[in-house]
């Protein structure tokens, strides 16, 4: 019974739950690694050892947070749980493939951890650039294990993407068009398209790196007519869409949360929101070289990538102002989920502004590989993606479990987290402007003050993570059941009660034509 339900599951709700639990545990690992980083940087001098072990920790922190925390929770967890419920489908289009997508992740995670355990570990940064990732600078199996880990995670995501695209296009009730599906469904579909188009390029790049390392090919070795810059193009053609993959489902969740707690029946500017997401998805593929402004590209190339990158601010602005317009005139309920959503809008916008700064190729020459870049992407990830996950979690927790979280604890948790992440990452803008480089385990004494404050902030965030564990325990221990949910007419996922039955929509949903 237990094995049939959890190991061989074909139920989108159970698989979504598995993704959530896996992502939560991976998030603990990623948090631990981030605490190691900030402990090392809390004061000048050495704590862990040399830069190799430090860079192994930094690399693992990135991979764990991206591939095993944010993506499994947002796409695998929320996506699996909510998409079929929101479109009135009985399950995903390919339920067994769905199960395989999940079970590819634990082996992938194991391979990543194994890469740290053998030889000296993969101290390459998450970009895995050759020649540092070649078989001279990184002799041994570490980088190879990392590459295999990425292959498995990539296959998992590609299969998941195929599944979501098929489900969303094919399993709606015949009466409704794509433009009547909720924004979260749209966000997952666009994310899936991005995954489907970008991951094969990453797979090609890291496979070439694998053969360069082991089979004596020279794709990225100038001695044999190769070019390490080719690797950078291949990696970033995946890497830039990837950062939009990490944030787009968050956009979808924030739209739902803001609409719900503003007491509105629909988000402001639905079509504008959809087109904005599609524009972001398209533009995300044609700006990749802004990560490479320092490798010596032609001035006209730099001009193009600068302007193209700035254009992405327009659809992003459409989304931000539409969220504000949704709030406008609403009967606002200051629930914990709403606090996360408001925090998201504010902090994501700050991250977007520093992104506009970095898009200037001339400025980026100075700021590239400094802590300014670290501050920028942690504002959009640690306060964008993670805030969206937390908001979605506290909003849909009653749907997933049937129990309610304690409102007061949830608000305290938000406050601690808000203070912690801002104290961690705001000072890093100053460090970057002062020229402190990334990926070094030590620094000149001049940078001590802001680094110490930053490290203190990370420990505040750690207490927030611990409080969250307590909060979830408290909810399950207290067993406060959900009586009823308001606004189900425009929030289809809630109509089956909390939690919904094992099988939902066994008959096709009936859609009234008046809507």
Swiss-Prot record:
Na(+) binds at residues 40, 45, 441. SUPFAM superfamilies: Cytochrome c oxidase subunit I-like. There is a cross-link at residues 240-244 (1'-histidyl-3'-tyrosine (His-Tyr)). Residues 1-11, 87-94, 171-182, 262-269, 328-335, 401-406, 479-515 are mitochondrial matrix. It is an enzyme of class 7 (translocase). It is a multi-pass membrane protein. Keywords: Calcium, Copper, Electron transport, Heme, Iron, Magnesium, Membrane, Metal-binding, Mitochondrion, Mitochondrion inner membrane, Respiratory chain, Sodium, Translocase, Transmembrane, Transmembrane helix, Transport. Residues 41-50, 118-140, 213-227, 287-298, 358-370, 434-446 are mitochondrial intermembrane. This is Cytochrome c oxidase subunit 1.
């Amino acid at each position: 019974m237990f094995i049939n339900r959890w190991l061989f599951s074909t139920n989108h709700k159970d698989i979504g739950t598995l993704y959530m639990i896996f992502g939560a545990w991976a998030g603990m690992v990623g948090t631990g690694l981030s605490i190691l980083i900030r402990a090392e940087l809390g004061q000048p001098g050495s704590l862990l050892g040399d830069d190799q072990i430090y860079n192994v920790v930094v690399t693992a922190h990135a991979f764990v947070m991206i591939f095993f925390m944010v993506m499994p929770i947002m796409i695998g967890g929320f996506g699996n749980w909510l998409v079929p419920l929101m479109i009135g489908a009985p399950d995903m289009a390919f339920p067994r493939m769905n199960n395989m997508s999940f079970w590819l992740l634990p082996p992938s995670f194991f391979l990543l951890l194994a890469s740290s355990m053998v030889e000296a570990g993969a101290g390459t940064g998450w970009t895995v650039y050759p020649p540092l990732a070649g078989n001279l600078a990184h002799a041994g199996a570490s980088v190879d294990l990392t590459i295999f880990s990425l292959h498995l995670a990539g296959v998992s995501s590609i299969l998941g993407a195929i599944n979501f695209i098929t489900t969303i296009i094919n399993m709606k009730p015949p009466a409704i068009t794509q433009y009547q599906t909720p924004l979260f469904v749209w966000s997952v579909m666009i994310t899936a398209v991005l995954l489907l188009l970008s991951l094969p390029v990453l797979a090609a790049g890291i496979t070439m790196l694998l053969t360069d390392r082991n089979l004596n090919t020279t794709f990225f070795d100038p001695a044999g007519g190769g070019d390490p810059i080719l690797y950078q193009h291949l990696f970033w053609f995946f890497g830039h869409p990837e950062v939009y993959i990490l944030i787009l489902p968050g956009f979808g969740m924030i739209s739902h949360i803001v609409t719900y707690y503003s007491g509105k029946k629909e988000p402001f500017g639905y079509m504008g929101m959809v087109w904005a997401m599609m524009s972001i998805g398209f533009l995300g593929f044609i700006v990749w070289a802004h990560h490479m402004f320092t490798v010596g590209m032609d001035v006209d190339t730099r001009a193009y990538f600068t302007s193209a990158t700035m254009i992405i601010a327009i659809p992003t602005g459409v989304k931000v102002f539409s969220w504000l317009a949704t709030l406008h005139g609403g009967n606002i309920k200051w629930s914990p989920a709403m606090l996360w959503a408001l925090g998201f809008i504010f902090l994501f916008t700050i991250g977007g502004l520093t992104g506009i700064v970095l898009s200037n190729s001339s400025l980026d020459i100075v700021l590239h590989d400094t802590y300014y870049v670290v501050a920028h992407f942690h504002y959009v990830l640690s306060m964008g993606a993670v805030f969206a996950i937390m908001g979605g979690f506290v909003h849909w927790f009653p749907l997933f479990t049937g129990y309610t979280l304690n409102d007061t604890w949830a608000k305290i948790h938000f406050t601690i987290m808000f203070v912690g992440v801002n104290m961690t990452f705001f000072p890093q803008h100053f460090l970057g402007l002062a020229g402190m480089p990334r990926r070094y385990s030590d620094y000149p004494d001049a940078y001590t003050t802001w680094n110490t404050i930053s490290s203190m902030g990370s420990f505040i965030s750690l207490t927030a993570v611990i409080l969250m564990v307590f909060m979830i325990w408290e909810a399950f221990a207290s067993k406060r059941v959900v009586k009823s949910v308001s606004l189900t007419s425009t929030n289809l996922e809630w109509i089956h009660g909390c939690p919904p039955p094992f099988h939902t929509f066994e008959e096709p949903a009936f859609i009234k034509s008046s809507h």
